[in-house]
Amino acid sequence: MLKLFSAFRKNKIWDFNGGIHPPEMKTQSNGTPLRQVPLAQRFVIPLKQHIGAEGELCVSVGDKVLRGQPLTRGRGKMLPVHAPTSGTVTAIAPHSTAHPSALAELSVIIDADGEDCWIPRDGWADYRTRSREELIERIHQFGVAGLGGAGFPTGVKLQGGGDKIETLIINAAECEPYITADDRLMQDCAAQVVEGIRILAHILQPREILIGIEDNKPQAISMLRAVLADSNDISLRVIPTKYPSGGAKQLTYILTGKQVPHGGRSSDIGVLMQNVGTAYAVKRAVIDGEPITERVVTLTGEAIARPGNVWARLGTPVRHLLNDAGFCPSADQMVIMGGPLMGFTLPWLDVPVVKITNCLLAPSANELGEPQEEQSCIRCSACADACPADLLPQQLYWFSKGQQHDKATTHNIADCIECGACAWVCPSNIPLVQYFRQEKAEIAAIRQEEKRAAEAKARFEARQARLEREKAARLERHKSAAVQPAAKDKDAIAAALARVKEKQAQATQPIVIKAGERPDNSAIIAAREARKAQARAKQAELQQTNDAATVADPRKTAVEAAIARAKARKLEQQQANAEPEEQVDPRKAAVEAAIARAKARKLEQQQANAEPEEQVDPRKAAVEAAIARAKARKLEQQQTNAEPEEQVDPRKAAVEAAIARAKARKLEQQQANAEPEEQVDPRKAAVEAAIARAKARKLEQQQTNAEPEEQVDPRKAAVAAAIARAQAKKAAQQKVVNED
């Protein structure tokens, strides 16, 4: 009958499936009041102590900071962190943090100055006059986060609740063994906790406020009832001790009978839950104006001489707290951050205390039992019976081990609260929670990669669409900016295009010549004749210019005559070289000799005509004669070298000798004409006479060597000798005259 009446009572409670009853081990630490810990010399404050992104730094190395001074800026979901004491920022660098793998995260390292000075604190005792938005912003900027273990920013959680929250639940269950931080906080600070609950209720305006606490905390229950004696707006619900009654979904079901849907949140059913420690931090932030710089931490385990609960500054090294509590480590000492079921072993003791650190457990070697070897799953289903989330841990174990992420997701692995109840009851000692944590991390990484790929695809498609729009707009501008030509311009353009097309058609049209017909090349012939006539006219003008220049300058005329004679001799050599085996025609040679003599006479006449205008310098004439004689000698040598095997024609040699003698006479006449004005040096004349005699003798020797096989005509030889003797006599007479 009593059970029937209790079912209709207003404070009815429900029970969830599964759960376990491990040894509580709470009496080690809940019997002593909260105490302060001496300040450490150095504090390490990680920038990320919550779920979400880290804040933006607002301090630099070397800055002096005070307790409560912001070290980062909280924008959006980024929660700021604050200096736990006054001191100097000595470094901003990665440091190992509270993580199973001791991952390094960016941290601010502060050396304490020992003064522990606060920033100016501005409390809002009249918080009821403040708006909801102002209170949420203050809570957020003062760094308040969920202190029950999740670390979700409280301001963001309150903002997301909105006006749809009907029930505010304060979680005071603290169901995990060894942990007594909330129990001791409620015993020592019950009034402040209730005041923080009222601030949360003022922000959310719920229909009911429930405090859920397990029946294994009688002192805390007594203190809360004493504070709530005159209050009807807050209801205290004492629930049976069962692990994990402190889970958000489990406690919600116990107090309201409502189940949070798979993949959903408690706010979907009009429920919002906050921890006891969070309510206390809200009170200190709003009323006292103090950012969260410390929290209650349980120090327990048989390896600690003075177990209890302490106010630990955030950023304090774990080693400092344990040493203050009389830590006596063994050879293979293990230190667990958190409880024995949901906590993790610290790889080393220099990691700092953060906002989610609620317990430091240092058990002795035999306190938690000997670690046993993992064995194969026997499919006993004991884990499924103990699971408070109604999951199938054995199936999730196989899926996690086989990397079957889709099947693990289908079996709601995301609903696992990692309470460790399945691993506690497993007879094969399988660390199921470790497999589930790893699998959830891999699934989260895959989803994050898919999200980045989708965002990249969206950015690419948006960029392509933007480029297409810009291209279309650019083409439209070009079309609108194009100027349409007038009618007259259109006709001119059309005519020009027609001419171009006609020329292209003519150029590409092949020339076809029918059989028996002659091509009409009259145009080409006429153009060629015109070009020839133009060239002849230019040549005639050039010749007239050259003739006028030659008549005006007797020296140039003499040079041209010498060039002509050299060309004649070169032509004779080329003909001799081109016909080595052919007999020279004597008639042709005589004709060429006559032509050469005619050219020589013509040049002499030109010189004679030019002489009246300008008197020739006898010295220059002598130099030119010497040059002519040198050229004659060089030509004779070239002829001798070019025709070593060829029989020399005696007639041709006689002609050349006659030409040479004529040149000599011509030079002598020029010298005689030049003598009246200038006396010739007798020594030079004697030298020239000797040179002439030597040349004559050399010519006779060449003729003798060139005609070894042919009989020399005695008459011609006698004539040549007489001529040579006459030249010698004449030179001697000239020498005598010069000497007189």
UniProtKB/Swiss-Prot annotation:
Keyword Cell inner membrane in annotation: yes
Xref: InterPro entries: 4Fe4S_Fe-S-bd (IPR017896), 4Fe4S_Fe_S_CS (IPR017900), Ion_transpt_RnfC/RsxC (IPR010208), Nuo51_FMN-bd (IPR011538), Nuo51_FMN-bd_sf (IPR037225), RnfC_N (IPR026902), Soluble_ligand-bd (IPR019554)
Residues holding [4Fe-4S] cluster 2: C387, C416, C419, C422
EC top class, as a word: translocase
Pfam families: Complex1_51K, Fer4_7, RnfC_N, SLBB
An example Gene Ontology CC term for this record: plasma membrane
Its EC number(s): 7.-.-.-
UniProt main location, coarse: membrane
GO BP terms: electron transport chain
Region of interest: Disordered: 602-718
Subcellular location as annotated: Cell inner membrane
Record-linked Gene3D superfamilies: 3.30.70.20, NADH-ubiquinone oxidoreductase 51kDa subunit
Cofactor dependency: [4Fe-4S] cluster
Topology within the bilayer: Peripheral membrane protein
One Gene Ontology term of the molecular function aspect: metal ion binding
NCBIfam families tied to this protein: PRK05035.1, rnfC
Subunit structure: The complex is composed of six subunits: RsxA, RsxB, RsxC, RsxD, RsxE and RsxG.
Name of the protein: Ion-translocating oxidoreductase complex subunit C
Organism: Shigella sonnei (strain Ss046)
Source species taxonomy: Bacteria, Pseudomonadati, Pseudomonadota, Gammaproteobacteria, Enterobacterales
Gene that specifies this protein: rsxC
